[in-house]
């Protein structure tokens, strides 16, 4: 949760001058529909829950298992897109979803045999996937009337506040984790948030949210490779 908090605080810190000093974005934020702003705030809270549970899951299970299960987000996005936004899902997409479900079940069964602690991590990862799906679906709706910059700023702002509140509730201090934690937070802000989540948010206006979520399915393989070399996880 410390890493996620630093990541979002860095993001808000870097984006605030853009919003404040850019007349177009400033006017858009001031004139934004209050209902959409509230939705964006809710989206930010769910994003904070996603980060909190995903990072917590890594304490209980492997990077590969956690990332693979988090990627079941595509299932919940597809179902939500179909049920709540009247979207259409192709046969190939449903096939991909089925394969994702089977893969996740295999991981869960393997972790169940490995011990209850691993299964706890899997449950946290699954909850993180559901929260990420809600964040994505709200983004699809909000992006119809907002630019990427203003939408993501509101979401990240409320996400950062939510993470700070969670940090206070947990009793953990905000400081004292060394310069490495600050640097990692900055790097995650630059590459995972501004060049990751923000690009996905941009795409939500032009592409199906199910497709956006499916594009993240390469994460487990990449994460597994890094985990093998950095943490000797197999």
Where are these regions (language model features)?
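Hydrophobic alpha-helical transmembrane segments of multi-pass membrane transport proteins
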Residues: 38-60, 80, 106, 123-138, ...
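Hydrophobic/aromatic residues within transmembrane alpha-helices
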Residues: 3, 7, 57, 69, ...
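Membrane-helix interface linkers and caps
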Residues: 17-42
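Loop-to-transmembrane alpha-helix entry segments
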Residues: 67-70, 83-106, 118-122, 178-179, ...
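Hydrophobic transmembrane alpha-helices of multi-pass small-molecule transport proteins
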Residues: 15, 41, 80, 89-111, ...
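A helix-boundary/kink motif common to multi-pass secondary transporters
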Residues: 1, 62-63, 88-89, 147-148, ...
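Alpha-helical transmembrane segments of compact multi-pass small-molecule transporters, enriched
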Residues: 9-14, 69-83, 98-99, 158-162, ...
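Transmembrane alpha-helical segments that form core, pore/gating elements
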Residues: 1, 12-15, 77-78, 97, ...
């Amino acid at each position: 949760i410390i890493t996620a908090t630093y990541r979002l605080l860095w993001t808000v810190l870097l984006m605030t001058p853009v919003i404040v000093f850019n007349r177009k974005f400033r006017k858009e934020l001031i004139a934004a529909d209050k209902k959409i702003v509230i939705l964006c705030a809710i989206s930010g809270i769910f994003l904070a829950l996603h980060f909190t549970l995903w990072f917590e899951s890594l304490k209980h299970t492997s990077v590969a298992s956690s990332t693979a299960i988090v990627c079941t987000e595509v299932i919940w996005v597809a179902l939500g897109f179909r049920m709540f936004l009247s979207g259409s899902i192709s046969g190939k997409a449903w096939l991909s979803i089925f394969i994702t479900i089977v893969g996740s079940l295999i991981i869960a069964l393997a972790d169940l045999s490995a011990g209850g602690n691993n299964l706890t991590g899997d449950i946290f990862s699954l909850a993180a996937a559901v929260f990420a799906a809600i964040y994505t679906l709200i983004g699809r709706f909000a992006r119809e009337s907002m630019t990427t910059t203003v939408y993501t700023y509101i979401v990240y702002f409320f996400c950062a506040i939510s993470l700070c509140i969670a940090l206070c509730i947990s009793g953990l201090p905000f400081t004292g984790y060394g310069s490495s934690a600050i640097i990692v937070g900055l790097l995650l802000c630059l590459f995972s948030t501004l060049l990751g989540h923000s690009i996905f948010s941009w795409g939500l206006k032009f592409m199906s949210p199910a497709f956006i979520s499916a594009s993240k399915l390469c994460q487990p393989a990449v994460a597994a490779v890094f985990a093998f070399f950095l943490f000797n996880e197999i």
